């Protein structure tokens, strides 16, 4: 009888690693630093990430498939909020390792909500305590680390800085040790499961999130209507959907200056990501109530609700 592991190359490990935590705790920044390039969009605003996205890192015999998730949060009235919470919760199922990202000192109700879900997973858990580079006296961190260990006794606690990369080598080593023996799921040069169209839409949305600040209308999504390479130029037409005329005016800005700036910043990142000259055109359209319309959300790529 042939052993099921006989076909697995010696030393080969591969598995899924869910990165979970409350909104705006540094999950996407962590993924980007691990991958060594910008893949997941980031901003200072909560709920920037709306979809699960795979970030794939292959180093020698180890392939870690990281799942970047929306932050679990309490505001769940609209269909979009329910979608994000379900998406984040679903990531805890059928993964091989969970990285629970928390802030170095701040603990919220939403952190507690994530903790209560993580306590019931059957796979290994790593607690990544983020932003520890901002603490002058490391001894001040110890009570928080001890408390976290009490909450998840089987978990390994790792102080990190997602922004500066501090201790990420330690975190990745712990992940690799916990991955099962397996053939790799993806080609060595593949870094994500998401399409180029999806990544382009996310870059536009990121620039909107960063530009608008306190004016930010959260009822924004981006559709890519055209994505076509013609010679050396990649032509991208993106439609920005909002829910009200007032939001449309905010995005366009005075004499179109804001949408021009959004487009310029998005185009720069796209040219790096796609290694091509990019011609980006943006339009803004009002689609009332889309963020609370399950049918509209499905048509916009938000999956099952």
UniProtKB/Swiss-Prot annotation:
SUPFAM superfamilies associated with the record: P-loop containing nucleoside triphosphate hydrolases (SSF52540), Prokaryotic type KH domain (KH-domain type II) (SSF54814)
Membrane topology, from the record: Peripheral membrane protein
Region listing for G4, in residue ranges: 130-133
Compartments, record wording: Cytoplasm; Cell inner membrane
Keywords on record: Cell inner membrane, Cell membrane, Cytoplasm, GTP-binding, Membrane, Nucleotide-binding, Ribosome biogenesis, RNA-binding, rRNA-binding
UniProt-annotated stretches for the region G2: 47-51
MF terms in GO: GTP binding; GTPase activity; ribosomal small subunit binding; rRNA binding; small ribosomal subunit rRNA binding
Chain intervals for the UniProt region annotation (G5): 160-162
Residues the entry annotates as binding GTP: 21-28, 68-72, 130-133
Signal peptide: none
UniProt superkingdom: Bacteria
Keyword RNA-binding appears in the UniProt entry: yes
UniProt domain KH type-2: residue ranges: 204-288
G1, as annotated region: 21-28
Residue ranges annotated for the Era-type G domain, each copy included: 13-181
Region (G3): 68-71
Gene Ontology biological process terms in this record: ribosomal small subunit assembly
Gene Ontology CC terms: cytosol; plasma membrane
Keyword rRNA-binding: yes
CDD domains the record matches: Era (cd04163), KH-II_Era (cd22534)
Disulfide bonds: none
Subunit relationships: Monomer.
Function: An essential GTPase that binds both GDP and GTP, with rapid nucleotide exchange. Plays a role in 16S rRNA processing and 30S ribosomal subunit biogenesis and possibly also in cell cycle regulation and energy metabolism.
Family the entry assigns: Belongs to the TRAFAC class TrmE-Era-EngA-EngB-Septin-like GTPase superfamily. Era GTPase family.
Name of the protein: GTPase Era
């Amino acid at each position: 009888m042939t052993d099921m592991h006989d076909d697995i190359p010696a030393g080969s490990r591969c598995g899924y690693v869910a990165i979970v935590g409350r909104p705006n705790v540094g999950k996407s920044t962590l993924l980007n630093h691990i991958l060594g390039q910008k893949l997941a969009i980031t901003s200072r605003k909560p709920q920037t990430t709306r979809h699960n996205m795979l970030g794939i890192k292959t180093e020698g015999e180890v392939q870690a498939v990281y799942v970047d998730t929306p932050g679990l949060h309490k505001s769940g009235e609209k269909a979009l909020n329910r979608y994000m919470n379900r998406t984040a919760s679903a990531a805890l199922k059928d993964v091989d390792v969970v990285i629970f990202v928390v802030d170095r000192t701040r603990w919220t109700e939403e952190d507690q909500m994530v903790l209560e879900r993580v306590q019931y997973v059957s796979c290994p858990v790593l607690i990544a305590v983020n932003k520890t580079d901002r603490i002058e006296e490391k001894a001040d961190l110890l009570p928080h680390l001890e408390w976290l260990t009490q909450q998840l006794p089987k978990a390994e606690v790792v102080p990190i800085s997602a922004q500066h990369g501090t201790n990420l080598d330690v975190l990745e080593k712990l992940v690799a040790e916990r991955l099962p023996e397996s053939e790799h799921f993806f080609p060595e040069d593949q870094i994500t499961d998401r399409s180029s169209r999806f990544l382009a839409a996310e870059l536009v949305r990121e620039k909107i999130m960063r530009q608008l600040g306190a004016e930010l209308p959260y009822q924004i999504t981006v559709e890519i209507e055209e994505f076509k390479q013609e010679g050396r130029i990649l032509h991208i037409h993106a439609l920005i959907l909002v829910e009200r005329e007032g939001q449309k005016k905010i995005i366009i800005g005075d004499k179109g200056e804001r949408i021009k700036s959004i487009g310029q910043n998005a185009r720069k990142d796209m040219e790096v990501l796609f290694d091509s000259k990019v011609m980006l055109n943006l339009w803004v359209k009002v689609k009332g109530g889309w963020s609370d319309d399950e049918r509209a959300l499905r048509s916009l790529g938000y999956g099952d609700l």
